[in-house]
Amino acid sequence: MFRGMNTRQIVMDCVCIALCVLTLAAVLILWKRLPDRIVTNFDFSGEHGSYGAKSRIFVLIGIMFLLTGMFSALLRIPAVYRHINMPWTIPWGREPQIVCLTKDFLCVTNLCITVDNVYLTYACIRGKLIVWLMWLPYIVMFAATVWYLVRARKICKG
């Protein structure tokens, strides 16, 4: 099940799956206390724009499960080194390092997107969105992208 993944990748993947399951469990436990209509749309300032039935929260949770599942599946694809698409030539023998780095990057991306979706679910139920908190996972993801490219360049250049 976790073949080809290191401990850090396994932990991050399990955290993402646990966040999805906990979000679903929290919604199911609090279902009777949720308002009949929840916020389904926010504007750029974080104010609600429209309301919908509370069952629409399951669409958001379903998308969260789909994204987390896709990232988890990508982590489990066996590495085929000749198909790596990098802007630099990868020296012979360094492909496993690049694959491990890429899987780390996928884990960080998955965690950022999952945390953002959990917060969005909470904001829809609560009815208020804190805009800077919504962007925080994407800022972390941008920093991870820069880290990934710098680290990959160092590995390729030796």
Task: Mark where each language-model region is.
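Interfacial helix-start motif at the membrane-water boundary
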Residues: E47-L67, C100-L106
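Membrane-water interface of transmembrane alpha-helices
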Residues: I29-L34, G69-W88, Y148-C156
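Select subsegments of transmembrane alpha-helices in polytopic membrane proteins
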Residues: M12-I17, M70-L74, L101-I113
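Alpha-helical transmembrane segments of multi-pass integral membrane proteins
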Residues: C112-G158
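Active-site and channel-lining beta-strand-loop segments
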Residues: V27-V59
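Short membrane-interface loop/juxtamembrane segments of multi-pass integral membrane proteins
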Residues: P87-T102
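Alpha-helical transmembrane segments and their helix-start/interface "positive-inside/aromatic belt" motifs
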Residues: M5-L19, F58-L60
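Alpha-helical transmembrane segments of multipass membrane proteins
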Residues: L19, T23, I63, L67-F71, ...
